[in-house]
Amino acid sequence: MAHSIGNGFPPGVFSQLTRRQLVQNGVFGAGALAVGSLGLPRAARALDEINFWATGTLDIGDDGWRTFAYDSGVKVEFTDNGNDPGPVVAKLAAGNANDIYDVAGLQGGSEKELARRGLIAPWDISQIQNYASVWQWAKDIPYLTHDGKAYGIPTVINADSIIAIRDKAGSVDSYGAIFDPKLKGKTAMEDAWINSVIFTAIYLKNSENAKIAEPGNLTADELGLVMEFLIKHKRDRQFRTFWNGWEQGLQLLANQEVWVMTGWEPIVYAARMRGVDCYYAVPREGYEGWANNTILLKSAVVRGRTKAAHQLVNALFSGFYGCKLGLLRGYVVPTDNNVAYATAHANAFDPAGVRKLADHVKQKFAGKIYWQNTRPDNFQLYETWWQRLRNA
């Protein structure tokens, strides 16, 4: 169970979270090694109970889920899936996850693979009334559909870039700062190809005129170019480290071992709470966009929980969940219902703050965005190259 997350960003909670962590194993080959047996919640007994298996940062805590159940009529048993796409998909494909959970939340990119194998079911959008309120550009996110059917619901969105310490790094507006020899030994990237490769590809495409078509889905030649670039800089000791997991990334900033690094925006919130004057840079090359999408597991249909699953998703867009999640994580559920809910419940949420957060994310997506892809065409080659980087 993942109900231990409280208000704010306590690092202990996130020490095991790797929100867009390296997919270390293939799903149907080496990935089977990651399946194991799950630590299982109690099985949902009633048709109005849903076992929700999603990224820990999507949890809103016991009090939040109680309010959610009161408003929606759906009781939620939340379990953190770690959001490492490789093991999650493997547990759905070869493990027992589909026997236990009803609805899952996962970084976008795996929907088509899961749908083709019959592991997830399509959503009936007509049963999700609040889906009409979802921002259109969120509905247009890649990876949501397969064969004309909706398999992913864009529940949480954001765009990632660079974290910089103001009095050490000054004004940063380019990923080039990560590779700047003047900052040698004071930069870092995440130990995850699903983030670090696309950041590097975005930089090379836009600032070094590299012939890269789609940074989120590199050809073999493009991937080789990007990885050789990273390996060279690693050997030159440009990077302090490749960080892994929430706590390490936060600690690097808190101790000021690193002055500039690619990373997640909630790390900025947490570092500021520790007194670090850091900021999230606006990169001239563009952001890495991502969405955590909600998927309907096929076994939930067999167990007769389709109606409750659709009620759950509808309630995610009703406003309360978006307000609560924004307060806890600084993440946005892409609907204006959040502002409407905050306005109607100003004793619990600050309407101006909710609107400001929404405008902040909208502003990011009004610029240049390259979508993260957790399952690029050559994902196994990505894994091979990333291991070479680690060994370099």
Task: List PLM regions with ranges.
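Mature extracytoplasmic/periplasmic domains
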Residues: 296-366
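N-terminal secretory signal peptides
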Residues: 1-21
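N-terminal export leaders
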Residues: 18-35
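Conserved C-terminal helix/tail region of periplasmic/extracytoplasmic solute-binding proteins
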Residues: 359-392
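Early extracytoplasmic/lumenal segment of secretory-pathway proteins
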Residues: 47-113
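A bilobed periplasmic-binding-protein/Venus flytrap-type ligand-binding module shared by bacterial periplasmic
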Residues: 161-168, 202-203, 291-305, 324-327
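Periplasmic-binding protein-like
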Residues: 223-233, 274-298
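Extracytoplasmic ligand-binding site segments that recognize negatively charged/polar headgroups
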Residues: 58-62, 105-111, 115-248
